[in-house]
Amino acid sequence: MGATGDVEQPRGPGGAERGGPELGDAGAAGQLVLTNPWNIMIKHRQVQRRGRRSQMTTSFTDPAISMDLLRAVLQPSINEEIQTVFNKYMKFFQKAALNVRDNVGEEVDAEQLIQEACRSCLEQAKLLFSDGEKVIPRLTHELPGIKRGRQAEEECALRGSPIPKKRKGRPPGHILANDRAATGMVWKPKSCEPIRREGPKWDPARLNESTTFVLGSRANKALGMGGTRGRIYIKHPHLFKYAADPQDKHWLAEQHHMRATGGKMAYLLIEEDIRDLAASDDYRGCLDLKLEELKSFVLPSWMVEKMRKYMETLRTENEHRAVEAPPQT
């Protein structure tokens, strides 16, 4: 084929001819097609585009990555709606936390209890999206002071304690033991054995007008547990304690045995029980004992009578539970 000066120049995207060597002779046309920089640039751009498209395709072949990218986009909106739901129920958590602090002591961090309860709600909500057969793993390293519910049941079974069988079809999220384990509240005891309320210490006849009593807060300090108010009731649940009612607290305040506490709980313990504990192996030789903190006092007959009835009620309930308990196998 003969080369002429009518060889067509490569056109750019706008249709205009790109500048190149002047077509002065017929022999330059073939060289022009091979060395035109526009052609080289087009080829290079196609290679780059093809490579970039290939990389993007590789990134989206993993379904987990694709879904996580979508989740990351939606997460802020989801968080806002979750926060709205928690705000709706926050008043209940706040009232419960303040009630716990009033009953246990000022050392309880109400805000921490609320945060733990909210985290527990989120943990239990995961069960809504479980497969049914798969169990959601719990972060045991975050709960060093609490045994797993299954482990505690196995230990109770080895000791022969009766454990009620779980009902079939009941979701794990409604099991009280799991709920307690998820909150992380290590100050609440978890025991497989019922509290023993029997023997001479639970005989109402031991209470009379000459019996001396102490405040629970002072007993707590006397046994070296002053830093954690209410710990004595957790460590020794078998102790008899009487919750003073408003009439009792008014009398105690008038006699200067305690300060006016308003709505806070005030417990009365038997001084003899506390001194017996201090002499036991658990506290013998303990450097933190401060028995001088025990400021004992006697009570009027009308208050002693109420305490007798209360002790009798607790003891009777304990006996009924023992009778109704299934025999051990």
From Swiss-Prot:
Q: Where is this region: Important for dimerization?
A: 56-147
Q: What is its main location?
A: nucleus
Question: What does the subunit section of this Swiss-Prot or TrEMBL entry state?
Answer: Monomer and homodimer. A minor proportion may form homotrimers. Interacts with ZNF541. Interacts with the terminal deoxynucleotidyltransferase DNTT. Interacts with TRERF1. Identified in a histone deacetylase complex that contains DNTTIP1, HDAC1 and MIDEAS; this complex assembles into a tetramer that contains four copies of each protein chain. Component of a histone deacetylase complex containing DNTTIP1, ZNF541, HDAC1 and HDAC2. Identified in a complex with KCTD19, HDAC1, HDAC2 and ZNF541.
The organism's place on the tree of life at top rank: Eukaryota
Q: What is known of its domains?
A: The N-terminal domain mediates dimerization. The C-terminal domain mediates interaction with DNA and nucleosomes. It contains a HTH motif that mediates recognition of the consensus sequence.
Which is one Pfam family of this protein?
A: TdIF1_2nd
The organism is Bos taurus (Bovine)
The entry's function note states:
Increases DNTT terminal deoxynucleotidyltransferase activity (in vitro). Also acts as a transcriptional regulator, binding to the consensus sequence 5'-GNTGCATG-3' following an AT-tract. Associates with RAB20 promoter and positively regulates its transcription. Binds DNA and nucleosomes; may recruit HDAC1 complexes to nucleosomes or naked DNA.
In this chain, the stretch annotated as Important for DNA and nucleosome binding covers 197-316
This one is known as: Deoxynucleotidyltransferase terminal-interacting protein 1
**GO function terms (MF aspect):** DNA binding; nucleosome binding
One annotated Gene Ontology cellular component of this protein: nucleus
Keyword Cell cycle set for record: no
Instruction: Give the DNA-binding residues.
Output: 159-173, 216-237
Q: Which InterPro entries match?
A: DNTTIP1_dimer, TdIF1, TdIF1_C
Residues spanned by motif Nuclear localization signal? 164-170
- List, as start-end ranges, the regions of compositional bias called Gly residues: 12-22
